[in-house]
């Protein structure tokens, strides 16, 4: 029972669980999330677990169990989580903290050698001349554990999209491994 979330299947796949955080929970997270700036989160690992605990406390400890259950279930294995309503309270820093809290409810993230942080962050633009396919719009971005920029074993990958504006062709698409044509 999650009174503070709206939970349903994604409109295009029952393998993807949509979790929308209601305003009352967002309001309860503002204070604990403001205690730490992004730089503090980057340099002090315990602060990441502190904001994760704040998020989990809003659900009496049920959110972490639910997220881990989804990830370990082959029939789902995927969720999309975020505020139901976006406002000035849910700015980029808030969303980075929310993504940090979610990842730390699931486990201890690997250190990304390329970014030099516990997370990698980049902008995707309509036109991009970089050599990284990660920054190119309208290309498939396959989440996989081989070729990640870490030295540790990687159990799963999480991707958090902070903002999407003026996209040509619609929203980002997400497919479960079992839905790929080449895997059938």
Residue ranges and their predicted role:
Residues 1-184:
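Non-heme Fe(II) oxygenase catalytic core, chiefly the N-lobe of the double-stranded beta-helix
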